[in-house]
Amino acid sequence: MSKNLELWSSVEETDPRFTTKVNQRGGFTAIGAQYQFREATAKFGPFGIGWGVKDEHFTRYEDTGLVLYQSILWYKHYDNTGEVPIHSSIKYCLIGGRVDDDFAKKVATDALTKGLSKLGFNADVFMGLFDDNKYVNAMKQKFNGGEDTSIDWKKLVRAEMEGLDISNTVLVDS
C-alpha cells in the first residue's frame, strides 16, 4: 500500500450498524455523524487536541434564506498537522419565515462529515459500495461476526412497560 493511501485505507470501511438507508432524493446511505466523530477520535485523538475545526464563519443570505458555513478541518497525522477547507449550506428560514433553531449545528455537522470524507472516512459508502448487498453483508460479518445486533426498540419498550426484567435479555429485530 502506498504511504499516501495509508490514512485513507485505515478509515475507508464503514460498520453498517451506523448507517441508515434514506429513500429521499433518489435514495442514499446516511452515515451517523457521531460514528464518524468517534472514528476520527480513534484515529487522531480527542476533538480539540488531535483534530477539530477552526476559523468558523456563518454567512446568512437573507434573500434566499440560506446560511453558508465555512471553516477549516485540522487533524494531526504523525508529526504533521493537516488542514482541509470545509463548507456547507442549509436553509435556516423555514416555511412561514420561522427560523430553524438547529441550523448552525446541522450545517456545521454536514460540513465536518464531508471534510472527514475527503480524508477517506467511510469512503466505501461515498464510492457506492453500500449499494451492493454482498458488500454490506461482508462488512456486517467483518464488524460483528454477521450477528444482527440491532435492537428492536418496540420489544424493549413493551417489556419495560410490562415491568419485565430485561437486564439479561437480548432484544434484536426479528
What are these regions (language model features)?
Residues I31-Q141:
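Positively charged, aromatic-enriched nucleic acid-contacting surfaces
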